[in-house]
Design a protein with these regions (language model features):
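Polar/acidic, low-complexity leader/linker segments enriched in S/T/G and N/D
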Residues: 1-61
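Short beta-strand and beta-hairpin "edge-sheet" elements
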Residues: 121-150
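Short solvent-exposed strand/turn elements
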Residues: 143-165
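Extracellular/virion structural assembly segments
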Residues: 72-114
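A glycine-rich, hydrophobic loop/mini-helix early in the fold
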Residues: 45-86
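Ser/Thr- (and often Asn-) enriched beta-sheet segments in non-cytosolic proteins
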Residues: 23-28, 69-71, 86-88, 111-113, ...
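Ubiquitin-like/PB1-type beta-grasp interaction modules and other compact soluble beta-rich domains
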Residues: 162-175
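Beta-strand elements of well-folded, non-transmembrane domains
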Residues: 91-93, 116-120, 139, 153-155
Length: 175
C-alpha cells in the first residue's frame, strides 16, 4: 500500500536505489522532563538537518542529530491492527541512560518522531508529516533496550469525552 506522506524523491530512492543516494534515519525523543529533545541519527557521524515547519520544537530550524547506533523496524502501511515502530539500542550509552532515568520517574509518555532524510537533501524531512508515536513498552537487559512505539490508545478513549457529573451539570440531580 503506498504511503502518501513520503516525498517523490524518497519514493524513488526506495524503488530504484540509485547509486550514491543514501536514506538517513533520524529519531527525536521528547518528554516533559527532558531539558532538550534527544535527537539521534543512525550513522557514524553527526548531521545537521532542517526540521519541518510543523515540528513541535525548533520548527523550520537546522538542528544537530547525534550519531548513534540503533536499529529500527518501521510499521507496515496497512489497514490492519495498530502499527508499531520497534527501536533497539545496543550498548546503551550514559547519555541515553540520563534521559531514560528522567522519563522513568514520570507518568508522562515519551513521544518519538521518525524523520527520514536523503543524504543529498538535508533541507527537510522526506516524510511530511513525519511519523510521531508514543513509547508504549520498554524491555531492557544488560545488552540492549527495545522500545515498542505506537499511536495513542484510541479504542479505550471515552466517548463522548465530557464526563457528565453533578459538579459541572447540576441539572442531572433528580428529586
Amino acid at each position: 500500500m503506498p504511503d502518501p506522506s513520503l516525498s517523490a524523491a524518497i519514493e524513488e530512492a526506495y524503488a530504484s536505489a540509485p547509486a550514491g543516494e543514501v536514506i538517513i534515519h533520524t529519531l527525536e525523543f521528547r518528554h516533559p522532563s527532558f531539558t532538550t529533545p534527544l535527537r539521534v541519527v543512525r550513522d557514524k557521524q553527526d548531521i545537521t538537518a532542517t526540521l519541518e515547519a510543523s515540528a513541535p520544537i525548533d520548527a523550520s530550524t537546522a538542528v544537530t542529530f547525534v550519531a548513534f547506533a540503533f536499529d529500527l523496524e518501521l510499521p507496515d502501511v496497512t489497514t490492519g491492527p495498530s502499527p508499531e515502530l520497534l527501536i533497539t539500542i545496543d550498548n546503551v550509552s550514559r547519555e541515553v541512560l540520563v534521559y531514560m532515568d528522567q522519563a522513568a520517574n514520570s507518568s508522562d509518555l515519551i513521544e518519538v518522531t521518525y524523520r527520514p532524510y536523503l543524504a543529498s537533501d538535508l533541507s527537510s524531512p522526506q516524510m511530511d508529516p513525519p511519523l510521531t508515536m508514543v513509547v508504549r513498552d520498554v524491555e531492557a537487559d544488560i545488552f540492549s533496550i527495545t522500545a515498542r512505539c505506537g499511536f495513542g490508545d484510541f479504542a479505550n478513549k471515552p466517548f463522548p469525552r465530557d464526563v457528565y457529573d453533578l459538579t459541572r451539570f447540576p441539572g442531572l440531580l433528580t428529586i
